[in-house]
Protein backbone atom coordinates (compact mmCIF):
# COMPACT_ATOMS: atom_id res chain seq x y z
CA UNK A 1 0.00 0.00 0.00
CA UNK A 2 1.34 3.18 -1.10
CA UNK A 3 0.98 6.63 0.27
CA UNK A 4 -1.77 7.41 -2.22
CA UNK A 5 -3.89 4.56 -1.00
CA UNK A 6 -3.31 5.58 2.61
CA UNK A 7 -4.37 9.13 1.88
CA UNK A 8 -7.47 7.86 0.11
CA UNK A 9 -8.26 5.58 2.99
CA UNK A 10 -7.84 8.46 5.43
CA UNK A 11 -10.19 10.56 3.34
CA UNK A 12 -12.62 7.64 3.11
CA UNK A 13 -12.42 7.18 6.86
CA UNK A 14 -13.02 10.88 7.35
CA UNK A 15 -16.04 10.70 5.03
CA UNK A 16 -17.34 7.59 6.81
CA UNK A 17 -16.82 9.17 10.23
CA UNK A 18 -18.50 12.36 9.03
CA UNK A 19 -21.53 10.42 7.68
CA UNK A 20 -21.74 8.38 10.89
CA UNK A 21 -21.50 11.56 12.99
CA UNK A 22 -24.25 13.17 10.92
CA UNK A 23 -26.46 10.08 11.24
CA UNK A 24 -25.86 9.74 15.00
CA UNK A 25 -26.53 13.47 15.41
CA UNK A 26 -29.78 13.07 13.46
CA UNK A 27 -30.79 10.13 15.68
CA UNK A 28 -29.92 12.07 18.84
CA UNK A 29 -31.81 15.15 17.62
CA UNK A 30 -34.82 12.98 16.71
CA UNK A 31 -34.71 11.30 20.13
CA UNK A 32 -34.40 14.66 21.87
CA UNK A 33 -37.29 16.03 19.78
CA UNK A 34 -39.48 13.05 20.72
CA UNK A 35 -38.53 13.44 24.38
CA UNK A 36 -39.29 17.18 24.24
CA UNK A 37 -42.67 16.51 22.57
CA UNK A 38 -43.55 13.89 25.19
CA UNK A 39 -42.54 16.26 27.98
CA UNK A 40 -44.65 19.01 26.38
CA UNK A 41 -47.66 16.64 26.13
CA UNK A 42 -47.27 15.66 29.79
CA UNK A 43 -46.98 19.33 30.79
CA UNK A 44 -50.15 20.22 28.84
CA UNK A 45 -52.03 17.32 30.44
CA UNK A 46 -50.83 18.35 33.90
CA UNK A 47 -51.86 21.98 33.31
CA UNK A 48 -55.34 20.81 32.30
CA UNK A 49 -55.54 18.67 35.43
CA UNK A 50 -54.47 21.63 37.57
CA UNK A 51 -57.12 23.84 35.94
CA UNK A 52 -59.79 21.20 36.68
CA UNK A 53 -58.58 20.82 40.27
CA UNK A 54 -58.61 24.58 40.80
CA UNK A 55 -62.08 24.83 39.23
CA UNK A 56 -63.38 22.09 41.53
CA UNK A 57 -61.84 23.79 44.57
CA UNK A 58 -63.35 27.12 43.50
CA UNK A 59 -66.77 25.51 43.00
CA UNK A 60 -66.63 23.79 46.40
CA UNK A 61 -65.61 27.04 48.08
CA UNK A 62 -68.38 28.92 46.26
CA UNK A 63 -70.96 26.31 47.27
CA UNK A 64 -69.84 26.49 50.89
CA UNK A 65 -70.00 30.29 50.80
CA UNK A 66 -73.47 30.21 49.20
CA UNK A 67 -74.74 27.73 51.82
CA UNK A 68 -73.33 29.88 54.60
CA UNK A 69 -74.89 33.04 53.15
CA UNK A 70 -78.23 31.25 52.73
CA UNK A 71 -78.09 30.08 56.36
CA UNK A 72 -77.34 33.62 57.56
CA UNK A 73 -80.21 35.07 55.51
CA UNK A 74 -82.58 32.35 56.77
CA UNK A 75 -81.55 32.97 60.37
CA UNK A 76 -82.01 36.73 59.96
CA UNK A 77 -85.48 36.20 58.48
CA UNK A 78 -86.44 33.93 61.39
CA UNK A 79 -85.27 36.52 63.92
CA UNK A 80 -87.19 39.27 62.10
CA UNK A 81 -90.26 37.04 61.92
CA UNK A 82 -90.02 36.25 65.63
CA UNK A 83 -89.71 39.96 66.56
CA UNK A 84 -92.65 40.89 64.34
CA UNK A 85 -94.71 38.01 65.73
CA UNK A 86 -94.02 39.14 69.30
CA UNK A 87 -95.10 42.66 68.38
CA UNK A 88 -98.20 41.31 66.63
CA UNK A 89 -99.13 39.18 69.65
CA UNK A 90 -98.74 42.16 72.00
CA UNK A 91 -100.95 44.28 69.73
CA UNK A 92 -103.48 41.45 69.41
CA UNK A 93 -103.65 41.15 73.18
CA UNK A 94 -104.19 44.91 73.49
CA UNK A 95 -106.91 44.81 70.80
CA UNK A 96 -108.71 41.98 72.59
CA UNK A 97 -108.65 43.88 75.86
CA UNK A 98 -110.04 46.99 74.13
CA UNK A 99 -112.70 44.90 72.35
CA UNK A 100 -113.82 43.25 75.59
CA UNK A 101 -114.22 46.61 77.29
CA UNK A 102 -115.91 48.15 74.24
CA UNK A 103 -118.36 45.25 73.85
CA UNK A 104 -119.23 45.33 77.53
CA UNK A 105 -119.77 49.09 77.36
CA UNK A 106 -121.72 48.92 74.09
CA UNK A 107 -123.89 46.04 75.30
CA UNK A 108 -124.81 47.79 78.53
CA UNK A 109 -125.49 51.20 77.01
CA UNK A 110 -126.96 50.60 73.56
CA UNK A 111 -127.84 46.98 73.11
CA UNK A 112 -126.45 44.37 70.81
CA UNK A 113 -127.20 42.19 67.82
CA UNK A 114 -126.53 38.50 67.98
CA UNK A 115 -127.31 35.78 65.48
CA UNK A 116 -126.21 33.12 63.09
CA UNK A 117 -126.99 31.97 59.58
CA UNK A 118 -127.22 28.66 57.77
CA UNK A 119 -126.62 28.45 54.03
CA UNK A 120 -128.20 25.50 52.28
CA UNK A 121 -128.43 24.60 48.61
CA UNK A 122 -130.75 27.37 47.45
CA UNK A 123 -131.78 29.22 50.61
CA UNK A 124 -130.35 31.29 53.45
CA UNK A 125 -131.75 30.84 56.98
CA UNK A 126 -131.18 33.82 59.31
CA UNK A 127 -131.77 33.96 63.04
CA UNK A 128 -131.14 37.32 64.70
CA UNK A 129 -131.66 38.53 68.26
CA UNK A 130 -131.62 42.28 68.79
CA UNK A 131 -131.45 43.61 72.36
CA UNK A 132 -131.97 47.25 73.22
CA UNK A 133 -131.77 47.62 76.96
CA UNK A 134 -134.84 45.80 78.37
CA UNK A 135 -136.46 45.16 74.98
CA UNK A 136 -135.58 42.14 72.86
CA UNK A 137 -136.60 41.22 69.34
CA UNK A 138 -136.06 37.88 67.63
CA UNK A 139 -136.14 37.55 63.86
CA UNK A 140 -136.04 34.32 61.90
CA UNK A 141 -136.21 34.44 58.13
CA UNK A 142 -135.70 32.04 55.23
CA UNK A 143 -134.53 33.75 52.03
CA UNK A 144 -134.53 31.86 48.71
CA UNK A 145 -131.37 32.38 46.71
CA UNK A 146 -131.51 33.04 42.97
CA UNK A 147 -129.54 30.29 41.29
CA UNK A 148 -128.54 30.73 37.67
CA UNK A 149 -128.40 27.53 35.71
Curated annotation (Swiss-Prot):
Superkingdom to which the source organism belongs: Eukaryota
Key words of the record: Repeat
GO molecular function: calmodulin binding
PROSITE patterns for this protein: IQ
InterPro entries named among the record's database cross-references: IQ_motif_EF-hand-BS, IQCF
Residues covered by the IQ domain: 12-41, 68-97
Protein's UniProt name: IQ domain-containing protein F5
Species the sequence originates in: Bos taurus (Bovine)
Source lineage: Eukaryota, Metazoa, Chordata, Craniata, Vertebrata
Gene giving rise to this polypeptide: IQCF5
Amino acid sequence: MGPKVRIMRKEENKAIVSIQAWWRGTLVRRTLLHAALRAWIIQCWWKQKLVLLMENRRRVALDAFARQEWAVVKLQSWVRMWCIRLRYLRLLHAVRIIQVYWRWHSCHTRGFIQGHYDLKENQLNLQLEISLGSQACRVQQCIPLPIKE
